[in-house]
Amino acid sequence: MLFFGFLLAFLSAVPGTEGEIIPRCELVKILREHGFEGFEGTTIADWICLVQHESDYNTEAYNNNGPSRDYGIFQINSKYWCNDGKTSGAVDGCHISCSELMTNDLEDDIKCAKKIARDAHGLTPWYGWKNHCEGRDLSSYVKGC
């Protein structure tokens, strides 16, 4: 019985791998408050579509692409934008540790995502957006919010 108590205490102390799933309309509100509507010619619907297809609204989303990795709700890449200490030749364009992009505090994620969009003049760096959102009617992503 003591073993199970120890195991339960240990598992409670280990951070979850699922992260916080931010409800769609809550994220719409956050992005509006941070000036995403019209930013670099994008709409809130573009960003919501991007997030759905990149991370499914999960703040701790992680994707290993082999030579680099994607982190957080916007799936920001370690080759160009953040430092994970593992990616050879990383640029660290946002001057941030990739682990900071996997918290429930979205401030750093938002700053970096806006820098990426500003540098690219849009959302083309994100394959989730290019493959699922670009040129489509995205009104359903903000409907009811």
Curated annotation (Swiss-Prot):
Disulfide bonds join C25-C145, C49-C133, C82-C98, C94-C112. It is found in: Secreted. Residues 20-145 form the C-type lysozyme domain. GO terms for molecular function: lysozyme activity. The keyword Disulfide bond applies. It comes from the Eukaryota. The active site is at E54, D70. Its EC number is 3.2.1.17. It catalyses: Hydrolysis of (1->4)-beta-linkages between N-acetylmuramic acid and N-acetyl-D-glucosamine residues in a peptidoglycan and between N-acetyl-D-glucosamine residues in chitodextrins. It is an enzyme of class 3 (hydrolase). Residues 1-19 form the signal peptide. Belongs to the glycosyl hydrolase 22 family. Monomer. This is Lysozyme C.
